[in-house]
């Protein structure tokens, strides 16, 4: 895996980030505003508002496997903190109160802590894909330019986070991921999107969104990820088996891949 390429991406991506015009007038029917306020406040907590780092019991051992590993993980989570900052501005814009905990938030962190860093990173990948659906639906239906602009910024980042996970997994599985992994990937996606709908469905409906939109975004996102991962794995396998020296070995044994 090309660590330096991803480190450079995260550093460069800090630039050219036009801030939404938070001072623009805000107007929304009260019922819709109230539901949106709760939804965005909960998302602000989950999207970098808690412990914005790997929290699995073996996370520090994983980060300590190399300076490049530590740096790329830290840069990735720095971008998540930026999302939390943007969402905090959105919370203030719509007159919401900040949320300090929810059942879903506590469950999310409990799972991440107990099941190991590789499972945690799988969960985070799935959440990135589910969140893409959340922000797309919000951007389409919110009817407020600064909030839509915030969604565009976050979606730009999320797309590259998903690519980052694809490269990481291709380095670990040059022959492709197995059926069990795909099963877990799909199952976690369905579980996460149901949690999303149960927690935010009233907001989506008030804005004009539907359950079908959210579920379609998840399933299309997962299908696209698996297709791109298979293509990348084929390329990685060719490099690994077709070269000698350190390049192929690095792709297979890279610490971030295991």
Predicted feature locations:
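Non-heme di-metal
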Residues: 1-258
């Amino acid at each position: 895996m090309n660590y330096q390429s991803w480190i450079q991406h995260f550093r460069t991506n800090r630039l050219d980030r036009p801030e939404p015009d938070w001072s623009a007038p805000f107007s929304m029917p009260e019922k819709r505003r109230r539901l949106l306020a709760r939804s965005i406040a909960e998302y602000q907590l989950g999207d970098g508002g808690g412990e914005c780092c790997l929290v699995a019991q073996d996370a520090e051992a994983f980060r300590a496997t190399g300076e490049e590993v530590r740096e790329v993980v830290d840069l990735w989570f720095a971008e998540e903190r930026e999302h939390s900052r943007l969402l905090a501005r959105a919370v203030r814009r719509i007159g919401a109160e900040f949320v300090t905990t929810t059942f879903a938030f506590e469950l999310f962190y409990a799972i991440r802590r107990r099941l190991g860093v590789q499972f945690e990173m799988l969960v985070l990948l799935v959440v990135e894909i589910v969140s893409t659906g959340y922000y797309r639906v919000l951007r389409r239906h919110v009817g407020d330019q600064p909030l839509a602009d915030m969604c565009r910024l976050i979606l730009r980042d999320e797309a590259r986070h998903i690519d980052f996970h694809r490269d990481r997994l291709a380095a670990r599985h040059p022959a492709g991921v197995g059926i069990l992994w795909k099963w877990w990937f799909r199952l976690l996606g369905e579980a996460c999107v149901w949690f999303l709908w149960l927690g935010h469905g009233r907001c989506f409906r008030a804005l004009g969104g539907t359950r079908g939109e959210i579920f379609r975004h998840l399933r299309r996102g997962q299908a696209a990820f698996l297709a791109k991962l298979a293509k990348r794995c084929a390329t990685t396998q060719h490099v690994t088996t077709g070269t000698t020296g350190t390049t192929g070995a690095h792709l297979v044994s890279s610490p971030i891949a295991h």
